[in-house]
Design a protein with these regions (language model features):
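Conserved nucleotide- and phosphate/pyrophosphate-binding catalytic cores
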Residues: 1-165
Length: 165
């Protein structure tokens, strides 16, 4: 910053933390997941809503039950792979490639994994939705901590600029 250049290390310049192997999360249509595209899966929805979204919106091909399926060209498999262990993901790929395993079976497993994997987060979410004062209390505590940090920074800036009072 210009102040640091002119007056020394007044501000601590944050370092960016970027993940080199960050993945794009596909939406139900295979495109980038986005609320504006209406291709999202709300992980905090109830099981019935998640089931409806997966069964209706996750795109799969029309191959018959007995036909082998290509997991690598599947939005479904990409989503499944993101939320399950590598062991489960490999087993799903085997099932799809072998044939005799339909998209309906696969989607049922995805629904079960989504519901199970995010159960505790869903429970917390619903708790805080029903207890907004707890959220407000946490925000107030955070605001007090932030004010202390801001006051320290402002003091350091005033001192560096020669505005001690």
């Amino acid at each position: 910053s210009r102040i640091n250049h002119k007056y020394g290390e007044v501000f601590i310049i944050p370092e960016a933390k970027l993940q080199k192997n960050a993945q794009l999360i596909p939406g139900t249509d295979g495109e980038k997941m986005s609320k504006s595209r209406e291709n999202t899966i709300d992980l905090f929805d109830d099981e019935k809503s998640i089931k409806k979204i997966i069964n209706k919106n996750v795109i799969t091909d029309n191959s018959p039950l007995e036909a082998p399926k290509d997991p690598n060209n599947s939005t479904f498999y990409h989503l499944y792979n993101l939320i399950t262990s590598s062991e489960k993901s490999s087993k799903m790929a085997e099932n799809l490639k072998a044939g005799g395993y339909g998209w309906g079976h696969a989607k049922k497993e995805l629904i079960e994994e989504l519901v199970k994997s995010f159960a505790s987060q869903r429970e917390k979410f619903n708790h805080y939705i029903n207890h907004p004062q707890e959220v407000e209390d946490v925000l107030q505590k955070g605001a007090l901590k932030a004010k202390k940090v801001a006051d320290t920074t402002l003091s350091r800036v005033r001192e560096s600029l020669g505005y001690n009072s």
